[in-house]
Amino acid sequence: MKVVSSIGSLKNRSKDCQIVKRRGRIYVICKTDPRLKVRQGGAKMKRK
């Protein structure tokens, strides 16, 4: 799975791609071609 800063253009790669929001992150999942999986949203800042 790739991590990108913007998934605007990646959501239209295939007609089977879906946008899913889980735990504050946005995912693009594709069941027909799993290579197209993408996640947006980086690591959260940890407190010391």
Curated annotation (Swiss-Prot):
Keyword terms: Chloroplast, Plastid, Ribonucleoprotein, Ribosomal protein
Record GO terms (molecular function): structural constituent of ribosome
GO BP annotations listed: translation
GO cellular component annotations of the record: chloroplast; ribonucleoprotein complex; ribosome
Domain of life: Eukaryota
Subcellular location: Plastid, Chloroplast
Predominant localisation class: plastid
Pfam family, one: Ribosomal_L36
Entries under PANTHER family matching the protein: 50S RIBOSOMAL PROTEIN L36 2, LARGE RIBOSOMAL SUBUNIT PROTEIN BL36B
Family note: Belongs to the bacterial ribosomal protein bL36 family.
Designated name of the protein: Large ribosomal subunit protein bL36c
Organism: Guillardia theta
Lineage start: Eukaryota, Cryptophyceae, Pyrenomonadales, Geminigeraceae, Guillardia
